Design a protein with these regions (language model features):
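N-terminal accessory/interface modules of nucleic-acid-binding and processing proteins
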Residues: 1-265
Length: 265
């Protein structure tokens, strides 16, 4: 296990460098991370490195006990660090839903999808979660406004960590107010990109690569952690509330469909 831990640590270090080497790589990571938004940032990074197409990951015991699904013979787990600070030097292994199959005890895995008819409700959820949104002309604009509000409210909780981590990075000789401006801008765009990706919004039609050009400044593991954890944490806040809204709407629709069928019969 020690040898595998070392290999995964090396993979993590390489991936940290790769994802900020250019805007496209960072966007690819965000598009992967949005599908497993409840994971820690460091877990999302390792899932991206090993299975960028994973849509829903759990440990084998959770697949068995919670959803009655069994992992396919020969399936390879996705190795992640057991704890954020890596103090125990242990790995946890996740399996994607595509690595599992149903049993007689299976329960539905609640993977939600955005529908056009849910747009008004989702925008209302974003506003109730992150505050008043000025531009609600489209779902993309509402998400962008929510991301700005969220960054404004939450960036101070992470900014000090970035200030402490600038040594040896592109930010080392940069004034703190400029560092803060760049940080807030990249986090805002990254949170919006994650939420848009999960909701099926055309990110290419909204963002340009130039919107993420400053990600290359987060060129040490410490500065990238400050970016990654803030982005992941804030995006999770929004996506968790959106998930509740969409799940409730899906449940209402099933009830209505059931009533219609009863009336027809």
């Amino acid at each position: 296990m020690a040898r595998k831990y070392d290999l995964i640590s090396e993979l993590y270090n390489r991936t940290c460098k790769t994802v900020v080497s250019n805007p496209q790589n960072w966007q690819a990571f965000l598009a992967s991370a949005c599908r497993n938004y409840k994971l820690r940032y460091d877990e999302q990074l390792l899932v991206y490195a090993q299975r960028p197409d994973a849509t829903a990951v759990l440990e084998i015991e959770q697949w068995n006990k919670i959803f009655g699904r069994w992992v396919n013979r020969g399936a390879r787990g996705i190795a992640v660090f057991a704890d954020e600070n890596r103090s125990r030097q242990r790995l946890t292994h996740y399996f994607d839903i595509s690595d599992t199959h149903e049993s007689r005890y299976s329960r539905t895995v609640p993977i939600w999808d955005m529908r056009q008819e849910y747009e008004a409700d989702v925008i209302e959820t974003l506003e109730s979660t992150f505050g008043e949104i000025e531009n609600k002309s489209s779902l993309a604009e509402a998400i962008m406004g929510a991301a700005r509000n969220a960054a404004e409210d939450n960036i101070p909780d992470y900014l000090q960590d970035l200030y402490y981590a600038t040594e040896g990075s592109s930010f080392e000789e940069v004034e703190e107010d400029i560092v803060a401006f760049i940080y807030k801008n990249v986090v805002t765009n990254s949170v919006a990109y994650m939420m848009m990706s999960r909701l099926g919004v055309d990110t290419d039609g909204y963002f340009e690569l130039d919107d993420f050009r400053d990600v290359t400044n987060f060129n040490t593991q410490e500065t990238l952690n400050a970016l990654g954890f803030a982005t992941s944490d804030i995006a999770e806040m929004g996506l968790t509330e959106i998930s509740k809204t969409i799940t409730a709407l899906n449940r209402q629709n099933r009830i209505i469909v059931g009533q219609d069928r009863n009336e027809y019969n």
